[in-house]
Each structure stands twice: as C-alpha cells, then as structure tokens.
C-alpha cells in the first residue's frame, strides 16, 4: 500500500511538472505556464538573444495570473487627479513626487506575520497551590524549553463577588513574584516572616490592577517582562503571591485553589479573606487560575533554525534561486500596470545530487526524502529518477492596473514570487 501511494504521488508530481513546463522544441511559447520558474529554467540562457524569450515567458505568466488573454488596450491615460482619488479611496498606496505609485505592502506584511505566527507557540499552564497562603505556582511546560522570546504572557484570575455587595465598587489586586534571596541576606528574615515565606525568599511586585468588584468575572494581569526574565535565567517555575486588601470589605474573593483539596485548605485554618474558601470545589476548579504564554524561538537560536535556500552567485552549481527582475517600463507595460514598477521573476536552477535531495524545509521534503530512500536502493519505479530543482517557498504579490475599460483594479496574487528553491 505505501508503494502504491508513492507511485500515485510521483505520477501526479510528474504530470504537474510536465504540464507547467513548455515543450523543449516549442521555445516556451505554447501556453502561459502556471510555473514561471519551471519555464525560465528550461530556456537557453547561455544562447545569445535569449533574454527576449525569458521576458515573453514572464509576460505570459503575468497575463495568465491576472486571467487576461492579452494586455489591456489603454488608449488615453487617466488624469493624475483621478488616479490619486482612486488610490485614496482604495487605500492601496500613495503617489510619490516622481509620479510612481507605491503600494502598501499589506499582503507582504501579512505573509511575514503568518510565518512568524507559525514559529510562535501558545502554552496554557494551570496554577498549582503554593507552599504558603495566597500563593500559586505556574510550571511552564517542557514544550517551551526551546522558546526564548516572550510575545505575550498573562495570568488570569477569577474574582468571585457576592450578590449582596454594595459597599465598594472597586478593589485593587496585586501580584508579587516570589524570589529566592541569597543565603545570609541581612533583611531576609523580617520581611519573609511578614509575608509568611521561608527566610530565603523575598518578593517583588510584578502586576497591579484596579478591578470592578460588583460582579464575578475573570481578570487579566500582564506579566510578560517577568516571564521573559524567568526564561533568560533558565528557570521554568513562577511563584506568586496575590494580595487584595479591600476584598474583605466587599466579601469578594480570588479563587486560588490548585490541586490541594478543600479539606486540606480548611485544615490549615484558612478563612474567607480572599482565598475562595467555602465555594464548591468543582466550581473552584473551573475557575482555576492559569498562565497564558505566547513565545517563540530567538532568531539567533542555533537549534532548529529554518534552512534557507541558496542564492545563485555563479560559484555554485547546486540548486539555487536565480534573481531575475523585469521592469514594466522597459517592456512597455507601465502604461497599464500602475504598480509595482516591475516583477521579480526569480527562478530555480542547478543540480540536485542525491545527498541533498529533500533537504529543504518545505512540504516537498517528506515525499522527496522517502522517494530518494527508495531510489538510492534501486527500488522500481524510482531507480532511474532524478531529483529536480523547484521552488519550495513562494510569496504573494499585489498589482494595481487598468483593465480595458480603464477601471483601476487591485489584485493580490498568491505564490507569485519565488523566495527559496530546493530539490524535489
């Protein structure tokens, strides 16, 4: 069954490549290719006067992506004032002093944000009961062991308020982080006794918030800087103490119970002073405090760094990305394409030795590695296959242009520009 699946995948891949590449004898003019990189790679770049053929391939690709059979016929230029008004209403960019339109690269920024979000992990850690009254401990999951940059960190606490409260509308809630004090510190003992901690611990205020005490609800306390310091120190546990001095005036209480049983808390002599005593245990567990952490790896992190494709520099013959820019002014298309000023028609070229096949960080890698495994061992039907240099990462492109009716159109085209190349 796995072999049949691989054969089907391979045949489908070959069909796509053949379909998107021009026939060798046709000069690349048979149809607008779906993959400009494939078409450009097959053109004879070393042959004199081959540049026009590459430009023609790019032209056909752009028209194909815009669903146009031919370039629009713009008989009269649109007045600059009308163009400015249209761009302002479309919120797509601005016109520079030189008359060129600069597009706001929203789609590019979205792509960058999506890539960044893919690298970001979200971890939710529920609180455990601390070693002293009104204390909690948050153990950051081992899943976050390779995360070093905190994007956001918040502690969520539930404040329970009795229905009869009419005495105070606002209360102040403070969070203190417990920190170990170096042994032998002169003022450790007195301060620690005041807050009920062992002598080697002290505390620092990390978050404070004035909240509405007229209804029971969740409250969020930002603690990003504290978690960042914790990770920088190589630690994974956050110990905090909560304080709500005005809560007793309203009868309000913070639900703080972790895994300790209610009877154990009562055995310690806890009273209704902001600790959630006297509430049904099951409901308390549903209101259990938690830490929400969003973090990512540092760009300088040496491990699991995303492999980047090679840039062709004339010194390597291994699969790489070849830069190729087509100016719309140079090809006479700036009369109907308002922005951008040109197209980065990058393409992939180079050899794919067996030892680097399937090494890119793309979705092709898994299939390529499996097929390469069978191919190197001489298994049919993969024995005579050769790996291909293909795009592994593409980014979108925004275009602003006139149609035949001189209407201004903005279109975001996905997978338009080759960013990285790899071996299939």
Swiss-Prot record:
CDD domains: TGF_beta_INHBA
UniProt superkingdom: Eukaryota
Disulfide bonds listed in the record: 312-320, 319-389, 348-421, 352-423
A GO MF label: hormone activity
Secretion signal, residue range per the UniProt entry: 1-20
Stretches with biased composition (Acidic residues): 188-197
Residues bearing carbohydrate: 165
Region (Disordered): 178-197, 259-306
Subcellular location: Secreted
Composition skew (Basic and acidic residues), residue ranges: 263-275
Pfam name, any one: TGFb_propeptide
UniProt KW keywords: Cleavage on pair of basic residues, Disulfide bond, Glycoprotein, Growth factor, Hormone, Secreted, Signal
Chain residues in the propeptide: 21-308
GO annotation, cellular component aspect: activin A complex; enzyme activator complex; extracellular region; extracellular space; inhibin A complex; perinuclear region of cytoplasm
GO biological process: activin receptor signaling pathway; androgen metabolic process; androst-4-ene-3,17-dione biosynthetic process; endodermal cell differentiation; extrinsic apoptotic signaling pathway; eyelid development in camera-type eye; hair follicle development; hematopoietic progenitor cell differentiation
Assembly information from the UniProt record: Dimeric, linked by one or more disulfide bonds. Inhibin A is a dimer of alpha/INHA and beta-A/INHBA. Activin A is a homodimer of beta-A/INHBA. Activin AB is a dimer of beta-A/INHBA and beta-B/INHBB. Interacts with FST and FSTL3; these interactions prevent activin A interaction to its type II receptor. Activin A interacts with ACVR2A. Activin A interacts with BMPR2. Inhibin A interacts with ACVR1; this interaction creates a non-signaling complex (NSC) that inhibits ACVR1-mediated BMP signaling. Inhibin A interacts with ACVR2A.
Family: Belongs to the TGF-beta family.
Known role: Inhibins/activins are involved in regulating a number of diverse functions such as hypothalamic and pituitary hormone secretion, gonadal hormone secretion, germ cell development and maturation, erythroid differentiation, insulin secretion, nerve cell survival, embryonic axial development or bone growth, depending on their subunit composition. Activin A is a homodimer of INHBA that plays a role in several essential biological processes including embryonic development, stem cell maintenance and differentiation, haematopoiesis, cell proliferation and tissue fibrosis. Signals through type I (such as ACVR1B or ACVR1C) and type II receptors (such as ACVR2A, ACVR2B or BMPR2) which, upon ligand binding, phosphorylate SMAD2 and SMAD3 intracellular signaling mediators that form a complex with SMAD4, translocate to the nucleus and modulate gene expression.
Protein name, UniProt field: Inhibin beta A chain
Organism the protein comes from: Sus scrofa
């Amino acid at each position: 069954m796995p072999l049949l699946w691989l054969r089907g995948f391979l045949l489908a891949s070959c069909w796509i490549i053949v379909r998107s590449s021009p026939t060798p004898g046709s000069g690349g003019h048979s149809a607008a290719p779906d993959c400009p990189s494939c078409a450009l790679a097959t053109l004879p770049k070393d042959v004199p006067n081959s540049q026009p053929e590459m430009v023609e391939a790019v032209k056909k690709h752009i028209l194909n992506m815009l669903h146009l059979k031919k370039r629009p016929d713009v008989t009269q230029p649109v007045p600059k004032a009308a163009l400015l008004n249209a761009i302002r209403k479309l919120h797509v960019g601005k016109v520079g002093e030189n008359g060129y339109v600069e597009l706001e690269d929203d789609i590019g920024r979205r792509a960058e944000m999506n890539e960044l979000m893919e690298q970001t992990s979200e971890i939710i850690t529920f609180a455990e009961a601390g070693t002293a009254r009104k204390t909690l401990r948050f153990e950051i999951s081992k899943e976050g062991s390779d995360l070093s940059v905190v994007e956001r960190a918040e502690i969520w606490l539930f404040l329970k308020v009795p229905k009869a409260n009419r005495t105070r509308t606002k209360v102040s809630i403070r969070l203190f982080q417990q920190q170990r004090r170096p042994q032998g510190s002169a003022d450790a003992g007195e301060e620690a006794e005041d807050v009920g901690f062992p002598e080697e611990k002290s505390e620092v205020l990390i978050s404070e918030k004035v909240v509405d005490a007229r209804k029971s609800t969740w409250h969020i306390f930002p603690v990003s800087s504290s978690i960042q310091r914790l990770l920088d120190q190589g630690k994974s546990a956050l110990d905090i103490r909560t304080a709500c001095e005005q809560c007793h005036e309203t009868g309000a209480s913070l639900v703080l119970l972790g895994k300790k049983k209610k009877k154990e808390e009562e055995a310690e002599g806890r009273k209704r002073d902001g600790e959630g005593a006297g509430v049904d245990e099951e409901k308390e567990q549903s209101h259990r405090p938690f830490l929400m952490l969003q973090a990512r790896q540092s760009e300088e992190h040496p491990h699991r760094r995303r492999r980047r494709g090679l840039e062709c520099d004339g010194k390597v013959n291994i699969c790489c990305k070849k830069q190729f820019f087509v100016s719309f002014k140079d090809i006479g298309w700036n009369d109907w394409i308002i922005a951008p000023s040109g197209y980065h028609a990058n393409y992939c070229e180079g050899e794919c030795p067996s030892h680097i096949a399937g090494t890119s960080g793309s979705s092709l890698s898994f299939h390529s590695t499996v097929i390469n495994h069978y191919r190197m061992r001489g298994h049919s039907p993969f024995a005579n296959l050769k790996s291909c240099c293909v795009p592994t990462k593409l980014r979108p492109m925004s275009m602003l242009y006139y149609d035949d009716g001189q209407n201004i159109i903005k279109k975001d085209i996905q997978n338009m520009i080759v960013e990285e190349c790899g071996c299939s």
